[in-house]
A protein has these predicted regions:
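Residues lining hydrophobic/aromatic ligand-binding pockets adjacent to catalytic sites
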Residues: 1-206
Length: 206
């Protein structure tokens, strides 16, 4: 049985969902320490002006560094009305895409309901996105942290927003994008880009 080890993600990239789809079992890490500028609380979308990163703010504890907090304990901040900002950005970027209206009612609630913990928020997103993709991965969460797990394909640092590492099993496939005529094809964006542009054919690109 093949097993992949992944970080938790906020509307993660296509590569992340490919692993969910192709592996027999997926473990999601919840005991690692928080790091800035990762897919844990960031997704990347294509807009009229190019790529845009949408980041979920997390609470900072004045008594200890945020970077010492395990991901399972990270709380979402309500700073700067980020929910409204993110939803408006998605509307602006994808309102002209073929399937935005079709999926809007499934996605909008994530920008209306408040979640306390980032990992619970991300898990709710994962379940909904998997339903929309019509994939049914076997997902569980780690019980402790292992730096070098055995008999598992570890993608925790491979699927990295800032410094991605080689992944021979992931070859991005071109699909239609709203702003491709301006910026060219943008690979491995948030799974939302694939869903809004390709609809129920999105699964064939995983």
């Amino acid at each position: 049985m093949s097993t992949a080890l992944l970080q938790t993600t906020y509307f993660g990239p296509i590569q992340w969902y490919q692993k969910l789809y192709r592996y027999d079992q997926t473990l999601i890490e919840q005991h690692d320490s928080y790091q800035k500028q990762t897919y844990r609380n960031r997704c990347v979308i294509a807009t009229a002006n190019g790529l845009q990163a949408l980041t979920v703010p997390v609470e900072h504890n004045v008594q200890r560094s945020t970077f010492s907090v395990q991901c399972k304990d990270l709380r979402i901040s309500d700073h700067n009305q980020w929910r409204r900002i993110h939803w408006n950005a998605l509307q602006s970027a994808y309102s002209e895409s073929p399937f935005f209206d079709y999926y809007a009612d499934d996605i909008r609630p994530f920008f209306e309901k408040r979640y306390e913990f980032l990992i619970d928020f991300n898990e709710a997103i994962r379940q909904t996105v998997c339903d929309l993709l019509d994939i049914h991965p076997n997902v569980s969460y780690t019980s402790d942290f292992s730096l070098q797990p055995s008999a598992i394909d570890d993608y925790r640092e491979v699927i990295n927003a800032k410094r991605p590492q080689p992944d021979a099993d992931f070859q991005p496939r071109r699909y239609w994008q709203v702003f491709e005529d301006r910026h060219g094809f943008q690979a491995n964006l948030s799974i939302l880009d694939l869903l809004f542009n390709m609809g129920n054919e999105a699964v064939f690109y995983l």
